[in-house]
From Swiss-Prot:
Protein's job: Found in functional membrane microdomains (FMM) that may be equivalent to eukaryotic membrane rafts. FMMs are highly dynamic and increase in number as cells age. Flotillins are thought to be important factors in membrane fluidity.
Membrane-related topology note: Multi-pass membrane protein
Membrane-spanning segments: 5-25, 27-47
One Pfam family per UniProt: FloA
UniProt subcellular location: Cell membrane; Membrane raft
GO cellular component labels: membrane raft; plasma membrane
Provenance organism: Thermoanaerobacter pseudethanolicus (strain ATCC 33223 / 39E)
Gene that specifies this protein: floA
Protein name as annotated: Flotillin-like protein FloA
InterPro entries: FloA
């Protein structure tokens, strides 16, 4: 009985020991690598565990690469994983590039992956070009008619410029700029409607893919529509603005005229006050002249008669003017 218990304890200890060893050493993965012809040491897998690198994240892509004929070192795969890269996607990209006869080295693919680009998608796009559809671009021809253009841009990924190259947004912006420039240089919107391919030829010859991660293969005009008459609208707005400016200037002149009128009225009142003041000095001057003997009494009365006669004639003239006015009415 004692021997049986001792045997159970020994078996239990052996089971615990093997469980710890197998959990620390991926024995099944090591056997799979050997079966696939990948030479990898058991202690290499243990080292991955110590460096907290999941061995299956490295060994499975390595098996895939070796089977595809890729010469990849396990240390490079582990270093790429520790740098935050996607090892499996890099290996898939290398295999896809090899099948498509595209020159792509592991270092280049790893750099593209670490730069945040989808290296596998880039390789696939190099084989199967992608069509980018631009939004509707509105441009105005020289005759003032708006033309709305929609284009499709066929691009292919440029592996050599994926790191540091501009993306799809830059391509769309440059194509839109080229469309606006081409339509704007057309003498009439009819030229654009008759020859829409002239837009694609002109834009394609501008080398819009410079500095981008893509190579433009073709630019096709998908749709061309006629929009608003921008020229006429601008002329209407300009005429309205000129009208408002003229009204403002007329109002300014009217205000100045009113101010000038008020100034003249004030001057008239001032002159009248001076006349009244001067008339008040006349009796004093007459008295002084009579006192000093410069005029006689008869001269004074003659002057008074002339003044009275003048006043009578003025009154007759006013009465005649009033009667004529009444007869006209």
């Amino acid at each position: 009985m004692t021997e049986f218990i001792f045997l159970l304890v020994v078996i239990g200890l052996i089971f615990v020991f093997l469980s710890v060893i197998l959990s620390f050493i991926p024995l099944g993965l090591w056997i799979s690598a050997l079966a696939a012809g990948v030479k990898i040491g058991i202690f290499t897998l243990v080292g991955m565990r110590l460096r907290r690198v999941p061995p299956d994240k490295i060994v499975k892509p390595l098996i895939k690469a070796i089977k595809a004929g890729q010469d990849v070192e396990i240390n490079k795969l582990e270093a790429h994983y520790l740098a935050g890269g996607n090892v499996d996607k890099v290996i898939d990209a290398l295999i896809a590039a090899q099948r498509a006869n595209i020159s792509l080295e592991f270092e280049r693919a790893a750099a593209i992956d670490l730069a945040g680009r989808d290296v596998l998608h880039a390789v696939q796009m190099s084989v199967n070009p992608k069509v980018i559809e631009t939004p509707v671009v509105a441009a105005v021809a020289k005759d003032g008619i708006e033309v709305k253009v929609k284009a499709r841009v066929t691009v292919r990924a440029n592996i050599d410029r994926l790191v540091g190259g501009a993306g799809e947004e830059t391509i769309i912006a440059r194509v839109g700029e080229g469309i606006v420039t081409t339509v704007g240089s057309s003498n009439s919107h009819k030229e654009v409607l008759e020859n829409p391919d002239s837009i694609s030829r002109t834009v394609l010859n501008k080398g819009l893919d410079a500095g981008t991660a893509f190579e433009i293969l073709s630019i096709d005009i998908a749709d061309v529509d006629v929009g608003r008459n921008i020229g006429a609208r601008l002329q209407i707005d300009q005429a309205e603005a000129d009208k408002r400016i003229a009204q403002a200037k007329a109002e300014e002149r009217r205000a100045m005229a009113v101010a000038r009128e008020q100034e003249m009225k004030a001057m008239v009142q001032e002159m009248r006050a001076k006349v009244v003041e001067a008339e008040a000095e006349v009796p004093k001057a007459m008295a002084e002249a009579l006192r000093t003997g410069k005029i006689g009494v008869m001269d004074y009365y003659n002057m008074r008669n002339v003044i009275a006669d003048t006043m009578m004639r003025e009154s007759f003239s006013k009465l005649g003017q009033e009667r004529q006015q009444e007869e006209k009415e």
